[in-house]
Amino acid sequence: MAAQTEEIAGLVESVIRPLIDNPDDLVIDARETEDGSIFVEVRVNEEDAGKVIGRQGRAIKAIRTLARAAASSTNTHVDVELLD
C-alpha cells in the first residue's frame, strides 16, 4: 500500500473512531485503483452507521471532503464509501 493511501486510511480512521460506540467493529480497507485514485471502504457496526452518516449525510460528506483535501496536493482522487 502506498504511503499516501495509508495516510488517507489513517485520517479516515482517526475521524470515524471517536464518533462510534463500537470501535472494535471498525474496518477500513484502502487501496489504490488502476487509474491511481484511492478507494476507501469503511465498515462499522449497524448501530454506528447513522453516526457516521450524520444528519442529511453531513458527517460522511465532511469525511469525504477531508480525505480529498488531504490528497489534493498530489491531484489524487479519493472516494470514501460506507458499506453495510
Residue ranges, per PLM feature:
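RNA-contacting regions in translation and RNA-metabolism proteins
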Residues: 1-49, 62, 66-84
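Glycine-centered tight-turn and secondary-structure capping sites
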Residues: 53-57
